[in-house]
Design a protein with these regions (language model features):
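N-terminal signal peptide c-region/cleavage motif recognized by signal peptidases
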Residues: 15-17
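Bacterial N-terminal signal peptides that target proteins for export
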Residues: 1-6
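Repetitive helical segments and hydrophobic/amphipathic motifs
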Residues: 11-12, 71
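Short structured motifs
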Residues: 61-62, 364
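Outer-membrane beta-barrel translocator/receptor signature
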Residues: 40, 52-61, 67-151, 205
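Outer-membrane beta-barrel porins/channels
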Residues: 21-43, 110-112, 116-465
Length: 465
């Protein structure tokens, strides 16, 4: 016997919390944030910059570093990226196949700009930063033969042993074990498949910030206030195996229940604070805390039960993770700088008071988790003292897995579905290279960072007055 699983679709629209934290729309499961420090110079050194923080990008990276600047300075950066979001597309639980769907920028986008002005006692800065931009679509559908139309790769499935009433008596079993049960009782095991779906996300966060820093002896302290603007639309559209509409689930930053409605921007005010200690010209250390913004992003759904009209499921909130980190910088010789950072990203903020669209899963306490990540960054810069000095840079950083993961029980079909679609992912190792040319009042830097799932190129310019 084969049944189709209404994974993550609306089972009921009652008894929901008035407010909750995020939801289980597939395109949000592995969302890639850009918590790295801005600037091609930092990117080329594996993002290790907190202990150095010696140019205008420090306004966002670590505002305490602004005190090292003695002249007004302007920075502009553009980035181009390509990333892959991975969905479970086929296989039998737990032996599943995952496929990457590429998201990329169509052009070089302006992702950071800052202006810094030092005075006798304070250094002031103002900046623009784009820490999050993601737009793309993935699908889990049967793959058919181009000539015969027959399915050659089906959507993910699993098998459950059941009693005489069709209730599961245990967790998923293999196809072979299911066939063995059916030899004595044809109805002792049921095969389930997920419904085909398409899931898409379009999300962007923009930041306008002002920073101030001052120095006391060998210590510098800085802070920034950030007005953060956020826009999001994420949805999953499900169909039946015959291609008929089944359900649609949507999270957006405003009410989008009318056909012509477009998600509107939400804003929040957050703060950052940092310090830097530079006992001599060979060593410095710094630290920073960045508060994550919170944005109202309600969740809606439409099914046959709602007469295919959108109904609000919950007033969910999108909480950008908090970030805090420490870094050191060492200059053994004047032309060589070595940096190391440790950055803690609280991805668990994404699932605080999480609400599932599936009623069965919603009843499970803390069914979803997102692991906090400790990013380790290491990089270096070497300057060649030529007529036009130029630098070469290289770095490495480790991005631990932090996707939204289903960790609840798997004793019935509604619970196995999320385990298939929201699995634990892999750590990512990033390698970066970069370079730059420096004139007395102008500097241009470029860098490239890559991992298995993410690639980004950057070019930035600095001018001093």
């Amino acid at each position: 016997m084969r049944r189709f699983l209404f994974v993550a679709a609306v089972c009921t629209l009652i008894a929901l919390p008035l407010a909750a934290q995020n939801t289980d729309i597939e395109s949000l499961s592995g969302l890639q944030f850009n918590f790295g420090n801005p600037g091609a110079r930092s990117l080329g050194m594996g993002g290790a910059f907190l202990g150095l923080a010696d140019d205008a990008s420090a306004a966002e990276a670590n505002p305490a570093g602004l005190t090292i600047l003695r002249k007004p300075e302007i920075t502009l950066e553009g980035r181009n990226y390509q990333e892959q979001q991975v969905f479970t597309t086929s296989g039998t639980f737990p032996d599943l196949k995952r496929t990457g769907f590429s998201h990329y920028s169509q052009r070089i986008d302006a992702t950071f700009a800052s202006i810094v002005y030092p005075t006798k006692h304070f250094t002031f800065g103002a900046y623009y930063h784009e820490p999050l931009r993601n737009e793309g679509t993935g699908q889990v559908v049967p793959i058919r033969n181009d000539f015969t139309g027959q399915i050659k790769t089906d959507v993910p499935n699993f098998f459950l042993p059941v009693d005489a009433n069709g209730n599961a008596t245990g967790g998923p079993i293999s196809a072979a074990a299911c066939n063995k049960l059916r030899q004595t009782n044809p109805f002792a095991c049921i095969e389930y498949t997920v419904l085909p779906f398409l899931s898409s996300v379009k999300v962007q966060e923009k930041t306008l910030g002002v920073a101030v820093a001052f120095q006391v002896g060998k210590f510098s302290f800085g802070a920034a206030a950030r007005s953060q603007r956020f826009n999001e639309t994420a949805f999953t559209f499900r169909v039946t195996p015959t291609g008929d509409f089944s359900s649609i689930s949507v999270q957006a930053t405003s009410d989008i229940r009318s056909n012509n409605d477009i998600a509107k921007d939400k804003t929040d005010l957050t703060f950052t604070g940092g310090f830097k200690w530079a006992p001599n010209d060979k060593f410095s250390a710094g630290g920073v805390y960045k508060q994550g913004a919170k944005f109202a992003a309600p969740t809606f759904a439409a099914t046959e039960n709602t007469n295919f009209e959108y109904v609000k499921v919950a007033d969910t909130t999108f909480h950008i993770p908090d970030v805090y980190g420490l870094g050191v910088s060492f200059r053994p010789i004047p032309v060589l700088t070595i940096n190391a950072d440790a950055v803690r990203v609280k991805y668990s903020n994404l699932v605080d008071n999480f609400v599932s669209i599936n009623a069965t899963v919603r009843a499970i306490d803390k069914a979803y988790k997102a692991a906090d990540a400790l990013e380790l960054h290491l990089g270096g810069e070497y300057f060649f003292s030529t007529k036009i000095p130029f630098a070469v840079r290289a770095g490495y950083w480790r991005d631990p897995q932090h996707s939204i993961t289903y960790t609840g029980p798997i004793t019935n079909s509604d619970e196995v579905g999320p385990a298939i679609l929201f699995p634990k992912t892999k750590n990512q190792n990033h390698m970066s290279v970069g370079g730059g040319l420096a004139w007395p009042r102008f500097q241009i830097d470029f860098a490239y960072d890559r991992s298995d799932l993410f690639k980004v190129g950057s070019i930035s310019m600095v001018t001093r007055f």
